[in-house]
Amino acid sequence: EWETSVLDSLNRLEYYKETQWQECNEQTADRFSAVAFAFGQMLSDSLQVPIGLILNAVGGSPTEAWIDRKTLEFDFPDILTNWLQNDFIQDWVRQRAFLNIKKSSNKLQRHPYEPCYLYEAGIRPLKQFPIKGIIWYQGESNAHNMEGHEKLFRLLTESWRNNWQEELPFYYVQLSSIDRPSWTWFRNSQRKLMDIIPNSGMAVSSDKGDSLDVHPRYKREIGERLARWALNKTYQQNIIPSGPLFRTVTFKNGAAYVTFDYGAGMHTSDNNPIRTFEIAEYDGLFTPAQAEIIDNQTIKVSNK
């Protein structure tokens, strides 16, 4: 439960403390995002220029909190209605917010998880700065509603691009491999968004996740994967931005042939045959399948 003084400041949009640019050193980096630090360090080392990073992430916050009100009113008005009882918003988000504002007698009490709040408190004030691009590592609080997130994430990028540039680079992290059944489908949904949102890129994190912890300890690798997207797409560096990403599948002689972007030279990390592929026929039932790499960038999958 938050104190009255904190609740009052939230109603004045005074959630973030005033700050200033700080040089990166052992003390300032200790309080900063490890993923963002690794991202910035790789960019600075590669480009040989200083990189300025602004961190205003809020743990557990849902995507809708970061979108401007006009956009939500026009494109997703239902999510604005009575948000603490709104089923569009994840149960945990609403429960945490309700607990935080329990001491408030203000029927219009605001909270950082409220739709639009973090945009108003943390994004709109940055409009005066020439932002070069965005890295985004949130989404857990929207994983309960894959279809809703697909729409909200598109609205998020449009909302922020209205502040800066039409195709502001937007690089995001795919959710990791914690043991939650719905996250597999959510990760695939995030992958598809790359083909919908222009000038975007996705860093895979499932191989660096933790089955029990939503905050896995492998930060540097994730930050550097984001940096590869920025170096390739924003700074036009000759660097492969990603590991293999699904592109097409064709069917021939009882087998599926899967092609990938960034798949040249594809091989397994232990040089053993590919494992864990499954295939389904018309009945929709998946069974273990044989998979092999052919021509270094295509995988043949069959149940023979």
Task: Report each predicted region and the residues it spans.
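Cell-envelope and extracellular/periplasmic
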Residues: 1-304
